[in-house]
């Protein structure tokens, strides 16, 4: 089955071209993508849980193999308690990303003329204040991306980027076994209940499971870098620079906490940061969601969601919007008259 798609270039007077789109390239509904990519991410976390079992079992004996020489670890004093600081910053960065996504969602509703979201507005004294804080609309006037469906597209980029790098990390930690850093893994625990450890990996995204030996590359850095780049990319909808400054302060502090607590080697952080951000950038912001190749991974699923877009007709017009500058003031210009 193919569909006939005509694309118009904004700013031009002629069609870009006409093409027949095979069924496997037709985009799934965005809501379907979000729900199914959540399931796919959970499957990748389970796969990582199995990989952690292998990495933990294959880790060199700390009594025989000392930690690798590391320039930064030799320069930074060890502070074991800073491992908790890493977790705090992970929470702060993730919370920032969620707030940015929610505020952009409210902005899209506002621009579409939909009624404002309210909750407990009738509570005396604090009701109106809480509603302004939680549901107030922020608009910097800048449009780094088209505003249409920006929240589900943002979620899809998070889920797909994280899942791809999660699978890659699983293979990497099984491939080469690094000696433990100077932390609690110098006295490693034996995983007596492998299935339970995999379940704990799934429920806590790895933090609550026994996981020594999974050094190259850092799982903490993955989520820190992904939350950072999402907030960096989408926050200009709300304010030109405030959120960017906030996350730019948090990220290097989190890396310092990882190194000072001896949770990872320097290279573990550098590789994870590069791989995560590069993968995210490859999975671009697109009106159709994830790349069609990634949608093939979830197209076979019978549930949740539908496999077809109700308004996807044979003669649907797809508008291609050009956004040459990240902070352009209008990323969704109107079509010129013919």
Curated annotation (Swiss-Prot):
- Specify the protein's topology with respect to the membrane: Multi-pass membrane protein
Q: Name one GO molecular function term.
A: ceramide cholinephosphotransferase activity
Q: Which residues lie on this side of the membrane: Extracellular?
A: 58-87, 138-152, 211-222
The kind of enzyme this is, by top-level EC class, is transferase
Major localization class: membrane
Keyword check for Metal-binding: no
Where is the protein localized? Membrane
Key words of the record:
Kinase, Lipid metabolism, Membrane, Sphingolipid metabolism, Transferase, Transmembrane, Transmembrane helix
Cysteines joined through disulfide linkages: none
**Annotated active site:** 220, 264, 268
- Which superkingdom heads the taxonomic lineage of this protein's source? Eukaryota
From the UniProt record, give one GO term of the biological process aspect. Answer: ceramide biosynthetic process
This entry carries the following GO cellular component terms, namely: ciliary pocket; endoplasmic reticulum membrane; endosome; Golgi apparatus; Golgi membrane; plasma membrane
Q: Which PANTHER family match?
A: SPHINGOMYELIN SYNTHASE-RELATED PROTEIN 1 (PTHR21290:SF25), SPHINGOMYELIN SYNTHETASE (PTHR21290)
What family is it from? Belongs to the sphingomyelin synthase family.
Q: What does this protein do?
A: Bidirectional lipid inositolphosphotransferase capable of converting phosphatidylinositol (PI) and ceramide to inositol-phosphorylceramide (IPC) and diacylglycerol (DAG) and vice versa. Direction is dependent on the relative concentrations of DAG and ceramide as phosphoinositol acceptors. Essential for viability of the pathogenic bloodstream stage of this human protozoan parasite and, consequently, can be considered as potential drug target.
Protein name, entry field:
Phosphatidylinositol:ceramide inositolphosphotransferase
Q: Which organism is it from?
A: Leishmania major
């Amino acid at each position: 089955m193919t569909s006939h798609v005509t694309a118009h270039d904004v700013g031009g007077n002629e069609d870009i071209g006409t093409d027949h789109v095979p069924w496997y390239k037709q985009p799934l509904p965005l809501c379907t993508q979000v729900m199914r990519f959540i399931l796919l991410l959970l499957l990748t976390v389970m796969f990582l849980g199995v990989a952690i079992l292998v990495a933990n079992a294959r880790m060199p004996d700390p009594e025989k193999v000392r930690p690798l020489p590391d320039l930064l670890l030799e320069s930074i004093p060890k502070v074991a308690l800073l491992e908790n600081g890493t977790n705090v910053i992970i929470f702060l960065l993730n919370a920032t990303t969620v707030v940015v996504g929610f505020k952009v969602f409210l902005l899209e509703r506002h621009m579409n003329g939909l009624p404002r979201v309210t909750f407990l507005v009738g509570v005396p004294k604090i009701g109106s204040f809480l509603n302004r804080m939680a549901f107030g609309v922020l608009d910097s006037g800048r449009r780094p991306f088209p505003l249409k469906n920006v929240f589900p597209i943002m979620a899809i980029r998070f889920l797909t980027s994280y899942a791809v790098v999660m699978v890659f990390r699983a293979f990497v930690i099984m491939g080469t076994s690094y000696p433990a850093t100077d932390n609690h893994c110098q006295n490693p625990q034996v995983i007596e209940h492998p299935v339970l450890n995999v379940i704990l990996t799934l429920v806590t995204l790895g933090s609550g499971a026994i996981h020594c030996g999974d050094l190259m590359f850092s799982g903490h850095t993955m989520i820190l870098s992904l939350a950072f780049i999402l907030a960096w990319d989408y926050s200009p909808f709300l304010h030109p620079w405030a959120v960017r400054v906030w996350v730019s302060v948090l990220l290097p502090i989190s890396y310092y906490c990882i190194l000072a607590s001896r949770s990872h080697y320097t290279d573990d952080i550098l590789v994870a940061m590069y791989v995560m951000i590069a993968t995210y950038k490859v999975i671009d912001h697109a009106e159709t969601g994830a790349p069609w190749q990634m949608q093939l991974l979830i197209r076979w699923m019978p549930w949740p969601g539908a496999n077809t877009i109700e308004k996807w007709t044979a003669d649907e017009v797809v508008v291609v919007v050009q956004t040459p500058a990240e902070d352009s003031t209008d990323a969704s210009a109107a079509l010129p008259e013919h």
